[in-house]
Amino acid sequence: MYAYEQLPEDIDAIDMLVIMGGPQSPATTKEECPSFDAAAECACIARAIKAKKLVIGVCLGAQLVGETLGGRFEHSPEKEIGKFPIFLTEAGKNDPLFSLFGDSLDVGHWHSDMPGLTDAAIVIAKSGGCPRQIIRYQDFVYGFQCHMEFTTEVVRGLVQASRDELSASASLRFVQPVETLLTQDYQEMNQKLYHFLDALTTEYQRRTT
């Protein structure tokens, strides 16, 4: 779904809920962005979690998952725009779903906030600028602050829409220049994301059928 489209009401009709990113934050109001309703999105996420569905949040989506479960989003120590390594924690290294990630993996980033943590949350990966890059909130509920779904085409669109932001952030240590963003190879992280999703859905089917 996209701007102004209705959130799914029949959770039983879906198997997986993926909540993507955007320029907003969980604190953005409807007055500031009429097409975005954080409370309604969190309610939808809560229904999916209660129904034991697969739930994955990406960037803003990860922050909304955290908010739904009681973990308040925060500003990241560093703004990150570009392709930088994430480093798996011991929990991440021991999680078979991330077996192809190795100790570290270069992935996409475009954020200045990060998801909140709950008492049950486990940090799977962190980066040089953000201590909460991948979070397992509970079985089959994950938050990815990073963007492993980036492709050159996606990044080109983001660059075209974010010239002012990129110019204002150019001096920051975890913000790469446009030329670098557009010439990065995003295929390895894409393949690792596919492997994670395949492994996750296989395990979900094994435990729910």
Task: Name every feature range the model reports, one short phrase each.
Residues A48-R72:
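Catalytic nucleophile loop
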Residues I11-D12, Y137, V154-L158:
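Short aromatic-enriched loop/helix-cap "lid" or pocket-rim segments at secondary-structure transitions
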Residues G22-P23, A62, S112, M148:
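Active-site metal-binding loops of divalent metal-dependent hydrolases
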Residues M148-T209:
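Acyltransferase
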Residues C42-A46, F98, Y194-L197:
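Short amphipathic alpha-helical segments and helix-helix/interface helices
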Residues M1-I56:
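Flexible gly/pro-rich beta->alpha loop and the following alpha-helix that scaffold active-site loops
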Residues C33-D37, F73-E74, K126, Q160-S162:
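Glycine-rich, phosphate-binding/catalytic loops in enzymes
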